[in-house]
Amino acid sequence: NEDTKQKEEKLEIFIPNGPRLGDVVIEAHDVSKAYGDRVLYEHLEFSLPPAGIVGVIGPNGTGKTTLFRMIMGLEEPTGGSFRVGPTVKLAYVDQQHKSIDPEKTVYEVISGGADLIMLGNRQVNARAYVARFNFSGADQEKKCGMLSGGERNRLHLALALKEEGNVLLLDEPTNDIDVNTLRALEEGLENFAGCAVVISHD
């Protein structure tokens, strides 16, 4: 209907800016990664710019998620090293999505049951924050077990962005996402003052 269409066209995703980033964001120095005989990469070198949006593109199984896991210190490179700047605060949106109680509502999960949530040093009305991810009044009361793939992605985005990172690691954030949410996410990233690294297979 017309109301829904207008609401979707106006959809905005608000990405809170985390603490100010210094000059050193994330650097890879001669990084290699292999599992047994299977080499994912060798001699990987890069330096992320403080206000960049960087895409990591490649088919499944080429080590894109492994790269994020190494940046976060969850996995060790086979050789070489990563340097993460002292001002970096990571926020990670992953493919697997951490487990969420299917019986809780969207609002309960994102707000933690509080009327106000802290974004950095400012308080924000929890319902208004949830609404910024295209969950209207009725949608906020939906049980998480009943969400579509796109809605689940928006829920995880809202949770991760609440952490107020200044470096966003987005692992396939566009899977199952509708075109309006995708456009809103792209606009949100353009207005984001930090650095974003987006994994995609296309």
Residue ranges and their predicted role:
Residues N1-E2, E163:
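Intrinsically disordered, low-complexity boundary segments flanking structured domains
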Residues G18-D202:
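ABC ATP-binding cassette signature C-motif
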Residues D3-E27:
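ABC-family P-loop ATPase nucleotide-binding domain
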